[in-house]
Each structure stands twice: as C-alpha cells, then as structure tokens.
C-alpha cells in the first residue's frame, strides 16, 4: 500500500531502520510536502514533527488502517496538503512485525472486528509496550533509532482497550503531566488536552480519559494511568515530547473506531499547526532546564487529595453469576446508560528523587547496557 502511495505521490517517502525480532527491518513512512531526501535532516527541521506508532499490539489494528487512510487523504487533497505544509508526519505502519505476521481470528475474542489480525506478543513473545526503556528486543532498539532521527514534537501511539464498558468509542491517555514537568507539562494538561477535546467535540466525537479501572466500575472514580518509561509515551516523555496513547473501545464497531482514531490524529495535527511556535519553545526550554537540574524525580504516586470531576457517560454495572466459573462476574447493562459526575485523579506527586551523577561507570562486560 505505502509503496504504491509513495510511487504515486512524491510527498510520501519510505525508510527502513535496524532490524526487529522478526528479522524484518522497522519501516517509517514520512509525509512532507516537499518530500524527504535526507532522513537525517528531519530532526532539525523548523517544521512540526509528528511521530505515529501503530501495531505495537497488532490485534489492536485501528491505527494501522486509520494512518493509511489519513496519509492517502492528505496527498490526494490539495487543501490538506496546503494545510499541513508546515508539518512532517512520520508513521510507523506496524511496530510489532512478528506479531502482525502471526495472524488469527480468535486471540481477541471480545473485540468487535476486524475479522483477522495479528498477535499481541512479538516474534519472541515480548509485550513491546513494556520494553522501551530496557530494550530487550531489537524492535525497541530500532524504535529508539527512529525516535531520535525524527525528534518528534508530538508522539501518538494507537491502541484498542480491553476493559470496562462505557458509551465512548475512543479514549485518550496523555502522558502524565507532572512527570513531563514544568511549563511543558502544564501546557499539555491545561492547553493541549482540553483543546483536543474541544476539537473532537466539534466533530461529534465524544472522548474521555482512558478508563483505568480494575475489578470495579468507573463511577466509583479512577486515577490517570501512569505511563512509566517502560511504555511508549513514558519513554518519549524523557526527551520532552508531547505524547499520548489512543485507546479505542474493543466492543464498539471497527469502522467507528477507525474513523474516530482518524479524526483524533487530524485534531492533533491541527493543534500542532496552531501552536507550533509555543511547542518548540517549550521543548527547547525544557531540555535546557533539565541540564541545569541537580536532582531528578524517579518515583511518583497519585495524589488522592486532588481530583477533577468528569461528566462521564457509562453503563450500569452489576455482579452476576458466571456460567463459566460458577462465581460472580462484572456485567455492564448497555440498556441502562447514565451520565454522572465521576472523580478523576490525574495529579501525581514525587516520592523519590536522586542526585544527578556526573557519570555512570559500567564494567566492560555489561555491553548490553
């Protein structure tokens, strides 16, 4: 698909990086109105740099399809080409290539489409969204090469959620703003997030924060998912990139999920275009500030004293008898929708800091490090 798209449109360029555990390289598709002739020049471009990751869990394929539609529509529409003339949009078509090649129709039995998809684990059965900082896999090493080649201002990682049931077809999981820290974190929390929600509302797309509940129902309140550096957005945050994971809802129709992922990505592009100067200035200052610091936060915990109220649209949940286990299971009654104020805890406090050393000493045998 992307080979044909690049052959037909000079704005699309294809690149390969490193190798994944499958033996295949990791691919990168780049949109730039003027084309890309030297990939190493991207990281210093004055344009907005956006990196999109798809298929880290290949059964969660919404972003794979949405990205194909999105890039096709941009290059085939002169008004969109003009609109995003100041953006470089970089797409990893499928990050987990080994898992994508392991195709089936039964490992996500509770998901409403597509008919066939890849497997969650990679060629060595690693969950790649737990491997970014430790880099046990070749995939994560290739990702790091792509990431530092692009140096994205904004990073998007597309997923599908397995969890509670509610009315939304899509949720957002922004990187935790206290961890991002400083003025850049405040910008993410108080400007980028609410503006994206407004953009999507104008498109009739209802969105809410990722519903981070386990063994209970959302109306009891829930905290923001904490994306440590083992996760994609936790890793990219280490380099002052504004990151978010997209989590569509597995029970909603596949077409709806793909369309809303598509609309969210366009909304991110629009916000980035409109706030380009501010984003680049904040990232530059954040990098300078961290070099001047004497300490660095390592551990965080949710602040239960601070919360905001979400106008949450869910379904009534109850415990019913399970026909499989003879015990009880949680059941959401889609015939009983509700709209309630729900407490959402998205403030985190630092619980441990370290003094930043001048250097780390590694013995020669630790070549993997």
Regions found by a protein language model. Give the residues of each.
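Soluble metallo-hydrolase cores and metallopeptidase-like ectodomains found primarily
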Residues: 2-52
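Structural signal for hydrophobic packing residues in well-ordered secondary-structure cores
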Residues: 6, 75-78, 147, 200-204, ...
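Conserved beta-strand scaffold positions in the cores of enzyme catalytic domains, especially
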Residues: 14, 28, 91, 125, ...
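Active-site-proximal beta-strand/loop segments in catalytic clefts of secreted hydrolases
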Residues: 17-19, 31-33, 54-56, 92-96, ...
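Active-site/substrate-binding loop(s) of hydrolase catalytic cores
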Residues: 44-53, 61-219, 224-230
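Hard-cation-handling environments
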Residues: 213-369
């Amino acid at each position: 698909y992307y080979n044909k798209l690049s052959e037909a449109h000079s704005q699309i360029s294809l690149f390969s990086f490193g190798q994944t555990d499958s033996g295949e390289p990791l691919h990168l598709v780049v949109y730039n109105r003027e084309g890309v002739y030297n990939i190493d020049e991207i990281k210093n471009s004055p344009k907005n740099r956006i990196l999109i990751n798809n298929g880290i869990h290949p059964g969660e394929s919404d972003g794979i399809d949405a990205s194909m539609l999105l890039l096709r529509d941009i290059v085939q529409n002169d008004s969109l080409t003009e609109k995003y003339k100041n953006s470089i949009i970089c797409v990893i078509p499928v990050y987990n290539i080994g898992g994508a090649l392991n195709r089936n129709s039964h490992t996500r039995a509770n998901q409403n489409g597509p008919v066939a998809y890849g497997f969650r684990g990679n060629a060595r059965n690693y969950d790649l969204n737990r491997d970014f900082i430790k880099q046990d896999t070749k995939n994560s090493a290739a990702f790091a090469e792509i990431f530092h080649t692009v140096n994205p201002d904004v990073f998007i990682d597309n997923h599908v959620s397995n969890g509670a049931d509610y009315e939304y077809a899509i949720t957002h999981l922004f990187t935790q703003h206290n961890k991002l820290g400083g003025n850049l974190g405040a910008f993410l929390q108080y400007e980028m997030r609410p503006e994206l929600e407004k953009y999507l509302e104008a498109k009739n797309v209802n969105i809410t924060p990722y519903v981070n509940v386990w063994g209970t129902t959302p109306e009891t309140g829930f905290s923001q998912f904490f994306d440590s550096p083992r996760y994609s957005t936790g890793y990219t945050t280490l380099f002052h990139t504004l990151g978010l994971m997209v989590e569509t809802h597995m029970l909603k129709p596949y077409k709806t999920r793909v369309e809303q992922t598509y609309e969210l990505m366009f909304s991110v592009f629009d916000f980035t275009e409109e706030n380009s100067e501010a984003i680049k200035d904040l990232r530059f200052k954040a990098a300078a500030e961290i070099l001047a610091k004497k300490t660095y936060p390592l551990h965080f915990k949710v602040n239960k004293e601070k919360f905001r109220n979400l106008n949450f649209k869910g379904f009534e949940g109850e415990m019913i008898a399970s026909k499989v286990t003879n015990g009880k299971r949680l059941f959401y009654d889609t015939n009983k929708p509700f709209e309630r104020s729900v407490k959402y805890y998205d403030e985190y406090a630092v619980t441990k800091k370290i003094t930043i050393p001048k250097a780390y000493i590694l013995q020669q045998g630790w070549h993997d490090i």
